[in-house]
């Protein structure tokens, strides 16, 4: 009987100790967080104990995460420039193809040459 009573007392004391520890953790967690992300690279400094506050590590991780999540701005600009340059090259190639085609069709056609084409020459006397 005594061993059962001792076990019951031990289990009650353990439960009380666990509840006290949980209450202490809840009180400790109610304090302000160490760092809160605001904007890119900005963090809120807590008003409490500033000795425990480490600025460098969270900011480095946050900036690294932001760079890999959003992509580097230079890389995005390079992609946009490549798309724009590719479009310009495509338009120039299309214009060049049209001019070459028009010159080849004019050489085959039977229409008399117009006087505004100074780069053409005529072999007729």
Curated annotation (Swiss-Prot):
Composition skew (Basic and acidic residues), residue ranges: 112-125
GO MF terms, alphabetically ordered: metal ion binding; molecular function inhibitor activity; signaling adaptor activity; signaling receptor binding; transcription coactivator binding
PTM annotation, UniProt: Phosphorylated. Phosphorylation of Ser-102 protects it from the proteasome.
Keyword Phosphoprotein carried by entry: yes
Record InterPro entries: BEX, TF_A-like/BEX
Entry's Gene Ontology cellular component terms: cytoplasm; nucleus; transcription regulator complex
Binding-site positions, Zn(2+): 122
Expressed in which tissues: Expressed in central nervous system, with high level in pituitary, cerebellum and temporal lobe. Expressed in lung, skeletal muscle, peripheral blood leukocyte, stomach, lymph node, trachea and bone marrow. Highly expressed in acute myeloid leukemia.
Modified residues (Phosphoserine): 102
Superkingdom to which the source organism belongs: Eukaryota
Disulfide bond is among the record's keywords: no
Region (Disordered): 1-33, 104-125
GO biological process, one term: nervous system development
Keywords in alphabetical order: Cytoplasm, Developmental protein, Differentiation, Metal-binding, Neurogenesis, Nucleus, Phosphoprotein, Ubl conjugation, Zinc
Protein's cellular compartments: Nucleus; Cytoplasm
Region (His cluster): 114-118
PANTHER family assigned: PROTEIN BEX1, PROTEIN BEX1-RELATED
Subunit relationships: Interacts with neurotrophin receptor p75NTR/NGFR. Interacts with OMP.
Protein's job: Signaling adapter molecule involved in p75NTR/NGFR signaling. Plays a role in cell cycle progression and neuronal differentiation. Inhibits neuronal differentiation in response to nerve growth factor (NGF). May act as a link between the cell cycle and neurotrophic factor signaling, possibly by functioning as an upstream modulator of receptor signaling, coordinating biological responses to external signals with internal cellular states.
UniProt comment concerning the protein's domains: The histidine cluster (His cluster) and Cys-122 mediate zinc-binding.
Family: Belongs to the BEX family.
Annotated protein name in UniProt: Protein BEX1
Organism: Homo sapiens
Lineage: Eukaryota, Metazoa, Chordata, Craniata, Vertebrata
Gene: BEX1
